[in-house]
């Protein structure tokens, strides 16, 4: 086909993801080495098993299997009655054994799905499979990137960390959809308590991208023949949701430009260079046969059926969001904020147990989360100060302090200076003004603002707001605005 003919055809991007999730366990998947100290010196959290030394035998970590079953249940996947491990053979510096213990034709989970929303359109993404494997070591390129470095250092501390690889069907049609999926997946994993999103390298993505002629797509479905006839590019080294969207946007554009120029899309593996914002060719893409899979003889088949029903999962984000809307009468935006992580949802429910849910939602969703985000903090950072936070809400609810002062002064100093609410109120002199002080301030504001008084009597609504502001200024913000409004109207009516 000529370049002109190619340029006239309409193509659709077809994307599938392979998401590598580090499971949060105390030890590695096949040995007793710790996974907890991410700041350990390089190559100190290792043993003969994770270094692949002769004679060392793997022992499966039960906690990793339990975590995998939880993922399967959360994804509504079929969980295998019996599963098996295989050796995936390839040579790379971060793989000390020259093979990776993974799963081939007997994954622990298959045929799942995950709901996502993109621009208010909700749909299901099909999960082809999810299997357990061990993480390789990590590489640090010195003096450049992967293709320009002077040399590369290898750290095997990560080798053997439990990984779950979640493989989607090629269900994505845009980079934005992949970002929405990764956001949702991370949210679910955090709720399960098996994943730490703050850990370095805890979620890494490989993406497969093809351009398919739009006429070969029927109602969103793509024929097997169309998929098999299109050359596919795999992009590696994606380590964030935002990075995934950027990498895929670049790669889709690169492929479109190539097609429009009449060039063939090479079937290859490319590396996402985040610093330069481009993908770089690494090698021709391996076929499945290149890995020479065969059963791992040192690990017997695993009968998951014997205990998978004993493994439970918590209420998941979508269900909790819906419950919050119904039980606490929250709007969709507030419910989404308050269920963004399990820790936030738990925190809110603890506050809502003590106060009106609407008040609790306002304070947690609008005030607290905003101040925490500004400081790059999370709810987990103030878990031990829960009583102080509820005390602040109680002071506002009892009208011992104004909402404005509580939000703009007390809460901020509580977080910045680690002070109690009482300490901030005392140091800033923020206690409520007594009634005599407020009456005096009201009288003064009226006497000093004859134009505003005249405007009020002329029916101009803004005049009363101006006078309230004057009183609040005189009382240092310690008066109750609603009471000030009432007192002002009373005195103004008396002056008619």
Curated annotation (Swiss-Prot):
Gene3D superfamilies: 1.10.10.410, GatB domain, N-terminal subdomain. It comes from the Archaea. Residues 475-496 are annotated as: Disordered. It is an enzyme of class 6 (ligase). Pfam families: GatB_N, GatB_Yqey. GO terms for biological process: glutaminyl-tRNAGln biosynthesis via transamidation; translation. Its EC number is 6.3.5.-. Disulfide bonds: none annotated. PROSITE patterns: GATB (PS01234). The keyword Ligase applies. GO terms for molecular function: asparaginyl-tRNA synthase (glutamine-hydrolyzing) activity; ATP binding; glutaminyl-tRNA synthase (glutamine-hydrolyzing) activity. It catalyses: L-glutamyl-tRNA(Gln) + L-glutamine + ATP + H2O = L-glutaminyl-tRNA(Gln) + L-glutamate + ADP + phosphate + H(+); L-aspartyl-tRNA(Asn) + L-glutamine + ATP + H2O = L-asparaginyl-tRNA(Asn) + L-glutamate + ADP + phosphate + 2 H(+). Keywords: ATP-binding, Ligase, Nucleotide-binding, Protein biosynthesis. Belongs to the GatB/GatE family. GatB subfamily. Allows the formation of correctly charged Asn-tRNA(Asn) or Gln-tRNA(Gln) through the transamidation of misacylated Asp-tRNA(Asn) or Glu-tRNA(Gln) in organisms which lack either or both of asparaginyl-tRNA or glutaminyl-tRNA synthetases. The reaction takes place in the presence of glutamine and ATP through an activated phospho-Asp-tRNA(Asn) or phospho-Glu-tRNA(Gln). Heterotrimer of A, B and C subunits. This is Aspartyl/glutamyl-tRNA(Asn/Gln) amidotransferase subunit B. It comes from Haloquadratum walsbyi (strain DSM 16790 / HBSQ001).
């Amino acid at each position: 086909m000529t370049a002109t003919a190619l340029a006239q055809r309409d193509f659709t991007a077809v994307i599938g993801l392979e998401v590598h999730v580090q499971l949060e366990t105390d030890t590695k998947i096949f040995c007793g080495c710790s996974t907890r100290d991410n700041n350990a010196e390089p190559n100190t959290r290792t043993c003969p098993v994770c270094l692949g030394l002769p004679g060392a035998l793997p022992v499966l970590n039960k906690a990793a299997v339990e975590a995998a079953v939880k993922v399967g249940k959360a994804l509504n996947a079929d969980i295998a009655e019996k599963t098996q491990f295989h050796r995936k053979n390839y040579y790379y510096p971060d793989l000390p054994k020259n093979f990776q213990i993974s799963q081939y034709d007997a994954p622990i989970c298959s045929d799942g799905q995950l709901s996502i929303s993109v621009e208010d359109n909700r749909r299901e993404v099909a999960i082809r499979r999810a299997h357990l494997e061990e993480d390789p070591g990590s590489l640090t390129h010195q003096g450049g990137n992967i293709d320009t470095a002077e040399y590369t250092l290898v750290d095997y501390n990560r080798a053997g960390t439990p990984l779950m690889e979640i493989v989607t069907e090629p269900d994505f049609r845009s980079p934005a959809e992949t970002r929405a999926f990764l956001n949702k997946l991370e949210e679910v994993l955090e709720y399960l308590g098996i994943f730490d999103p703050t850990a370095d390298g805890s979620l890494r993505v490989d993406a497969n991208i093809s351009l398919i002629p739009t006429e070969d797509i029927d109602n969103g479905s793509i024929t097997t023949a169309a998929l098999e006839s299109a050359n596919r590019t795999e992009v590696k080294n994606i380590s964030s949701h935002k990075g995934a969207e950027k990498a895929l946007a670049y790669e889709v554009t690169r492929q479109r430009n190539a097609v429009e120029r009449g060039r063939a899309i090479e079937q290859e593996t490319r590396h996402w260079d985040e610093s330069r914002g481009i993908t770089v060719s690494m090698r021709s893409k391996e076929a499945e046969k290149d890995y020479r899979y065969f059963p791992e003889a040192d690990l017997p088949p695993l009968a998951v059926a014997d205990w998978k029903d004993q493994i439970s999962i918590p209420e998941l984000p979508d269900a909790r969001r819906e419950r919050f809307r119904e039980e606490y009468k929250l709007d969709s935006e507030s419910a989404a904020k308050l269920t963004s992580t399990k820790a936030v949802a738990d925190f809110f429910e603890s506050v809502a147990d003590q106060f009106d849910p609407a008040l609790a939602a306002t304070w947690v969703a609008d005030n607290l989360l905003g101040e925490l985000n500004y400081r790059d903090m999370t709810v987990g950072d103030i878990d031990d100060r829960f009583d102080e936070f509820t005390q602040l809400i109680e002071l506002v609810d009892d009208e011992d302090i104004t909402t404005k002062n509580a939000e703009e002064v007390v809460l901020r100093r509580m977080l910045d200076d680690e002070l109690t609410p009482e300490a901030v109120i005392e140091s800033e002199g923020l206690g409520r003004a007594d009634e005599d002080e407020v009456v005096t301030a009201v009288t003064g504001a009226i006497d000093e603002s004859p134009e505003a008084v005249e405007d009020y009597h002329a029916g101009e609504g803004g005049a009363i707001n101006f006078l309230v502001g004057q009183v609040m200024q005189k009382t240092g913000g310690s008066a109750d605005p609603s009471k000030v409004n009432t007192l002002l109207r009373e005195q103004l009516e008396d002056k008619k």
